[in-house]
């Protein structure tokens, strides 16, 4: 799955257009992209259900709410944050926290993570 990193919302939009034109239908828009929430909202409006969009580098429950409200269907976080998993699940979306050690993976799984991303 492509992880979108860009220097601006405009650059991010251009990258998504290129990926979609190439047949990619699932992508993660990271919160490191300036205007990431607005970009998610614009992409959801433009592409509707043609793209499965998620938010990445999400580190707190406020970002979970903002990105899901903007159209994210899944939430990826760089580490296991219980409140991120809980809020994502509460809102009915897929939670994918990052973890590295076996203990972190098991802890995330037991907390309700749908998937665990081995990271870094």
Segments from the language model and where they lie:
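Conserved anion-binding
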Residues: 35, 50, 59-120
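Conserved N-terminal beta1-alpha1 strand-loop-helix module at the mouth
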Residues: 1-74, 90
């Amino acid at each position: 799955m492509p992880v979108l990193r860009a220097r601006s919302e405009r650059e991010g939009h251009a990258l998504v257009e290129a990926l979609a034109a190439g047949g990619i239908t699932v992508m993660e828009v990271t919160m490191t992209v300036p205007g990431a929430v607005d970009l998610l909202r614009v992409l959801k409006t433009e592409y509707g259900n043609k793209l499965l969009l998620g938010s990445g580098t999400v580190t707190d429950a406020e970002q979970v709410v903002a990105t899901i409200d903007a159209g994210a269907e899944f939430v990826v976080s760089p580490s296991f944050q219980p409140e991120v998993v809980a809020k994502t699940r509460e809102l009915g979306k897929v939670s994918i926290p990052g973890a590295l050690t076996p203990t972190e993976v098991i802890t995330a799984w037991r907390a309700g993570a749908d998937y665990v991303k081995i990271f870094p």
